[in-house]
Swiss-Prot record:
Its EC number is 2.7.7.89, 2.7.7.42. Its cofactor is Mg(2+). It comes from Shewanella amazonensis (strain ATCC BAA-1098 / SB2B). Pfam families: GlnD_UR_UTase, GlnE. It catalyses: [glutamine synthetase]-O(4)-(5'-adenylyl)-L-tyrosine + phosphate = [glutamine synthetase]-L-tyrosine + ADP; [glutamine synthetase]-L-tyrosine + ATP = [glutamine synthetase]-O(4)-(5'-adenylyl)-L-tyrosine + diphosphate. One of its GO terms (biological process) is regulation of glutamine family amino acid metabolic process. GO terms for molecular function: [glutamate-ammonia-ligase] adenylyltransferase activity; [glutamine synthetase]-adenylyl-L-tyrosine phosphorylase activity; ATP binding; magnesium ion binding. This is Bifunctional glutamine synthetase adenylyltransferase/adenylyl-removing enzyme.
Length: 961
């Protein structure tokens, strides 16, 4: 900020700084002693520009004099390491180390922010200063922990007796020495060789030593204390992400990237850099990573990978409703990085000079190699500098991680002042021009967008035509006999013309509609497809990014029309949750259904894009994953790609993957406040989730809720390990409450699942989570027959192996009790009659697939009776929780004749499939009785044979009429 510009500080900033200075003078007058008029004015202005600087100097006013004693003029980066090592030399406790690191970080960041706001540091210098500070904090923290742990546990050694260090890869902007002010730091921990510690009380495996050290280092840097934090640490870029070990050896790292490394990990590794003093281990680490990142040949496949990654980022921008985002939006910072990294990955194998972590260094090399023209280099550099300066200043205002332009006048004034712009309008214009240039170069590099002249297509005329005669003539010319189409389109167009969608939205809609109409008229009856398709468009009318998505992706338009025609339920989902439109872009990916065993790993991968500590985004991501996968299942269902028998399997395995993540998130949130139950060993939870009903029976439908029961295995009265200790039983209660909260909270993407806990012991009046032995006692001594029927369909879906084994024992024991067949028949039939009286509401001549006599419920009751009546003699009947395999087992044991079992299975599958189909058509689960008479009559007859006739049921003859 020049002297001239300092004189033009806006009034609001001046007043804010003046009030702060007056308060400081009143409380700490000694801190201003010795400052001249120019220095006081600069202090006042900077306090008005940055809440973070003002806050930090209010806490430590003694630092003001130090800053003016030469610290603002230049930064000696080598001093960071020296001063931190001196400060930590006499520290003996982790809490003290945390305080030292945080206070040093805050002081230096205030100093660097001051230099940014006053124009004392060019961008490159500022980013290098922040990166050097971050590296010094990480490495001195690492070295202090290493010394402390070696004293207590011994020193990790390789087979030849050489000490082994913890090596840290700095990823992203930290690796490139381009870290911005409030960025997370992405790290990967590794060590050279396996071995054991020497010199401690007992030897410890090197990997275990370094995992403990890594956990403590993450905590040392990221835990929030009274002094704040050093950096938010993200470890999810390590091999296998969150599910992988925190620290792996060099050889394991090399094996992973050679065998399983993915395209996005190649991009991440372009900027990877071993932190700390360079050593032979640093060389070794970079050498083993190089073949994965840089291929020996010119690798144009990197372009397609980049397109996919950019597509994912665009999806995130839409899903998170990000506007004015100068990092992720079109033409943002990330697109510059993509342009440069794509060239690095394509040619870095042949051109060693491109193997640099520095973006500016790579751009200069690309120019010298003739890969970028001077104009492109000049535009990309200048645009990037403006956006990075704006990003850095935005974050330095209040030490917050943001890339979004301000939403208030004061912060706009601060930004304009620091960037020497007259006003918000001028700065916006400069930023928009910069982003337009970046996006132009990005498109020139990666392409992938559709170019088509709509004006030459008849549908452009049809969309714009005003006269009915002209519209009808256009349809006749195309041999389209659908008189209802033009009135529908005309009415919709008139309605939309009154909607305030802005000039950009209007222009995009006018480009989209001819293309969408081209897809619509390919349907057998275009007017029949009009309402579901255009309802989706109407829902995204004010979300221009989604209109652009449909405009630029012919595959997405084709899938939108075909799926909306095939299923009103899918159309409804797309209208309610527009982010699902992203899934339509690539038809091959849409119909590439996740395999049953991969839902868990897919979900873990999906959650990598979301900050671990952002609970709201984590909850939203879970819902978006569910909606996305559900859409893929439904799309494959209605098009016949997925056999209808497998639909429930996929919906069930999807739910189980989500349950696992919800429990882990809930556990982390409760444990962060209270610690964990003290009786647990590492990796244990002592907690289990039991599925009942459709989830337990592996028969989940599209709209099914989850019947769950929670169990734990602690009988004592111990406490948790955290600072806010609570009783273990109370911990598990809080865990259950948090799980239910994560499921039921309604976010932008709705509720995750509706969870029904009424099947727990004592129902709605019982505890939310039961101790497992108490659960067993309840089932043996207090549960009603209908609760044992429910237990037939129960299944362990999450938890410790010990709990899984004990639950299986309890379930088998309860189901295997000796029961009086006559009494059991009476109780089962009474419950079925009661259910029918409450739930069966059907018009004459119609058949309710679930509740009508001969329907799904009758089949389920037959299965439950067979298990309860026969398990005392035939233990195999307790193995399965799903109806189909219960009937198969009953046939194998000669409890049911094979033809009868086959008839029940056929009827059950048919009725369930019809129910799926009706759900996708958004219709009630009812059909004309005649349509299912063959199956229902057989079921009624078998029900009567197994359980006996009900006196209040009509005879079979009248039911079949």
């Amino acid at each position: 900020m020049s002297q001239q510009h300092q004189a033009e500080i806006p009034k609001e900033i001046k007043e804010k700084g003046s009030l702060w200075l007056a308060s400081l003078e009143a409380h700490h007058p000694e801190s201003l002693t010795g400052l001249d008029t120019v220095q006081r004015r600069e202090l006042e202005q900077v306090a008005g520009l940055s809440d973070f600087i003002a806050r930090e100097l209010s806490r430590h006013p003694e630092r003001i004099a130090r800053l003016f004693d030469g610290l603002l003029d230049k930064v000696d980066r080598s001093a960071f390491d020296r001063e931190l090592h001196q400060a930590l030399a006499s520290v003996t406790s982790e809490d003290e180390a945390k305080a030292v690191l945080r206070r040093y970080r805050n002081f230096q960041m205030a100093r660097l922010a001051w230099r940014d706001f006053t124009g004392k540091a060019p961008l490159g210098e500022s980013l290098l200063d922040i990166s050097s500070l971050a590296e010094a904090l990480i490495i001195t923290g690492r070295d202090w922990l290493y010394r402390e742990m070696c004293q207590s546990l011994g020193t990790p050694m390789d087979a030849d007796g050489r000490p082994q260090p913890l090596m840290i890869l700095g990823m992203g902007k930290l690796g490139g020495r381009e870290l911005n002010f409030s960025s997370d730091i992405d790290l990967i921990f590794t060590f050279p060789e396996h071995g054991e510690t020497q010199g401690g009380r007992k030897s410890l495996d090197n990997q275990q030593f370094f995992i403990r050290m890594g956990q403590r280092l993450v905590n040392l840097l990221s835990q929030v204390t009274v002094d704040g934090f050093v950096f938010r640490v993200d470890m999810r870029l390590r091999p296998y992400g969150e599910s992988g070990p925190l620290v792996v050896s060099f050889s394991a790292l090399e094996d992973y990237y050679q065998e399983q490394g993915r395209d996005w990990e190649r991009y991440a590794m372009v900027k990877a850099r071993a932190l700390g003093p360079w050593s032979g281990y640093s060389d070794e680490l970079h050498s083993l990573l190089r073949p994965f990142v840089y291929r020996r040949y010119i690798d144009f496949s990197a372009i397609e990978s980049l397109r996919r990654m950019k597509q994912l980022i665009a999806q995130e921008v839409r899903r998170r409703h990000l506007t004015d985002n100068i990092k992720l939006g079109a033409g943002g910072i990330r697109e510059v990085e993509f342009v440069v990294q794509s060239f690095q990955l394509i040619r870095g194998g042949r051109e060693p000079s491109l193997r640099t972590q520095s973006l500016f260094g790579a751009i200069d090399t690309l120019y010298s190699l003739g890969q970028l023209e001077y104009l492109a280099v000049d535009e990309l550099k200048n645009a990037y500098v403006l956006l990075r300066r704006a990003e850095n200043l935005l974050q330095a205002i209040d030490d917050k991680q943001t890339q979004t332009l301000p939403d208030n006048s004061l912060d706009w004034q601060r930004l304009c002042c620091a960037l020497e712009m007259a006003n918000e309008f001028d700065l916006r214009a400069h930023i928009e021009a910069a982003m337009a240039k970046i996006h132009r170069h990005f498109r020139a590099t990666v392409g992938g967008e559709e170019a088509e002249d709509n004006h030459e297509h008849w549908t452009w005329q049809f969309w714009n035509v005003q006269e009915e005669d002209h519209a009808e003539a256009l349809l006749q010319d195309q041999h389209i006999d659908d008189p209802a189409l033009w009135p529908l389109l005309k009415g919709w167009r008139e309605t939309m013309s009154r909607r305030p969608i802005g000039p950009r939205g209007r222009e995009t809609l006018d480009r989209l509609m001819p293309k969408l109409l081209g897809e619509l008229v390919s349907m057998p009856i275009p007017s029949a497809a009009f309402a579901p398709v255009f309802n989706v468009v109407e829902q995204v009318l004010t979300r221009t990014t989604y209109l652009e998505l449909l405009c630029e992706n012919p595959g997405a338009r084709a899938q939108l029309v075909s799926l909306c025609c095939a299923s009103p339920w899918i159309a409804d989902q797309l209208a309610k949750f527009p982010m699902l439109l992203d899934e339509l872009i690539d038809p091959a990916a849409l119909y590439d259904i996740t395999s049953l065993d991969d839902y868990g790993s897919e979900l873990r991968q999906y959650l990598l894009r979301v900050p671990e500590d952002d609970m709201e985004q984590q909850m939203e991501a879970l819902r978006q994953f569910k909606l996305t996968q559900q859409l893929k299942i439904a799309a494959a269902d209605v098009t016949g790609v997925l056999p209808i028998m497998q639909v429930s399997d996929h919906l069930t395995f999807l739910a189980e993957a989500i349950i696992e993540q919800v429990v882990h998130q809930a556990w982390g949130q409760v444990a962060s406040r209270h610690g964990v139950p003290a009786h647990l060993e590492s990796g244990q939870m002592g907690f289990a989730v039991i599925a009942y009903g459709k989830l337990g029976g592996i028969e989940l439908g599209y709209g099914s809720d989850l019947d769950l029961v929670f169990l734990h295995n602690y009988q004592g009265s111990g406490l948790t390990t955290g600072e806010r200790q609570i009783e273990t039983s109370h911990f598990y209660l809080k865990l259950a409450q948090r799980i239910l909260h994560l499921f039921s909270t309604r976010t932008t993407s709705g509720e995750l699942y509706e969870v029904d806990m009424r099947l727990r012991p004592s129902g709605a009046s019982g505890l939310l989570v039961s101790e497992i032995e108490r659960f067993g006692e309840y089932q043996q001594q207090e549960a009603w027959t209908w609760e044992h029927q429910a237990l037939v369909r129960s299944r362990f879906v999450f938890g410790d192996n010990q709990l899984a084994a004990r639950f299986s024992e309890i379930r088998a024991e309860v189901l295997g009790k000796v029961r009086d067949p006559a009494v059991l028949k009476g109780e089962v039939k009474a419950m079925r009659t009661k259910m029918r009286e409450h739930l069966l509401k059907v018009d004459e001549g119609m058949f309710d697939l679930k509740q009508s006599p001969g329907g799904i419920a009758d089949i389920e009751f037959i299965a439950q009776y067979l298990v309860l009546a026969g398990s005392a003699e035939f233990e195999d009947l307790t193995v399965w929780s799903d109806n189909v395999r219960i009937f198969q087992t009953a046939a194998e044991l000669d409890i049911l004749p094979l033809p009868v079992a086959q008839q029940l299975i056929a009827a059950y599958c048919t009725l369930r499939d019809e129910n799926h189909r009706l759900t996708l058509q958004r219709e009630a689960g009812q059909l004309p009785a005649i349509a299912v008479a063959e199956h229902s009559e057989r079921v009624c007859a078998i029900y009567a044979d197994v359980l006996g006739h009900d006196t209040d049921e009509p005879p079979l003859e009248s039911r079949s009429q």
